[in-house]
Amino acid sequence: PALPEDGGSGAFPPGHFKDPKRLYCKNGGFFLRIHPDGRVDGVREKSDPHIKLQLQAEERGVVSIKGVCANRYLAMKEDGRLLASKCVTDECFFFERLESNNYNTYRSRKYSSWYVALKRTGQYKLGSKTGPGQKAI
C-alpha cells in the first residue's frame, strides 16, 4: 500500500487533480519515483524531486499517476513491468483503494489482478508477482 501525504484518499470527482504528493511504501520505507527516462523505482530521500506525483481522477475510483518533474505517467505493461509513459494509455489507469490499514493500493485497471508494488530493495515488483494484502505495497 502507498500512504498518500494527505493522510488518506477517497474517490474524488473525475477530471480533478489531487495536490501533488508522494506515495510511500511502508515495506522498505521507499517513495515511488518516476524518472524522466521512463524508469520507475523507489527512493528513501524525501527531497528527491522525482517523487512528486500528480494523481488525476479518470473516473470514480480510477486514477492516473503522473511524475511532476518527469512529465510521464506510471504504466503497467502486459509483462507486469512498471515504467513511465510519455502519453496516457490504457496501461496508465489504476484503481485506487483506501485499505483498512489506512494505506492506499493501486491496482491496474487493464491487468486487474496486478498491483503497483515496491520490493524491500526499492525496485518495483512485477505485477504478476503481486496480489491483495501483499506486504510489498
UniProtKB/Swiss-Prot annotation:
Matches recorded under InterPro entries: Fibroblast_GF_fam, IL1/FGF
Official protein name in the record: Fibroblast growth factor 2
Segments of this protein annotated with the region Heparin-binding: 119-135
Gene: FGF2
Gene Ontology terms describing biological process: angiogenesis; branching involved in ureteric bud morphogenesis; cell differentiation; positive regulation of angiogenesis; positive regulation of blood vessel endothelial cell migration; positive regulation of cell division; positive regulation of cell migration involved in sprouting angiogenesis; positive regulation of ERK1 and ERK2 cascade
Keyword Nucleus carried by entry: yes
Record function comment: Acts as a ligand for FGFR1, FGFR2, FGFR3 and FGFR4. Also acts as an integrin ligand which is required for FGF2 signaling. Binds to integrin ITGAV:ITGB3. Plays an important role in the regulation of cell survival, cell division, cell differentiation and cell migration. Functions as a potent mitogen in vitro. Can induce angiogenesis. Mediates phosphorylation of ERK1/2 and thereby promotes retinal lens fiber differentiation.
GO molecular function: growth factor activity; heparin binding; integrin binding
Binding sites annotated in the UniProt record for heparin: N27
Quaternary structure and partners: Monomer. Homodimer. Interacts with FGFR1, FGFR2, FGFR3 and FGFR4. Affinity between fibroblast growth factors (FGFs) and their receptors is increased by heparan sulfate glycosaminoglycans that function as coreceptors. Interacts with CSPG4, FGFBP1 and TEC. Found in a complex with FGFBP1, FGF1 and FGF2. Interacts with FGFBP3. Interacts with integrin ITGAV:ITGB3; the interaction is required for FGF2 signaling. Interacts with SNORC (via the extracellular domain). Interacts with glypican GPC3.
Site positions (Important for interaction with integrin): K119, R120, K125
Sequence similarity: Belongs to the heparin-binding growth factors family.
One Gene Ontology cellular component annotation held by this UniProt entry: nucleus
Species for this entry: Oryctolagus cuniculus
Modifications after synthesis and translation: Phosphorylation at Tyr-73 regulates FGF2 unconventional secretion.
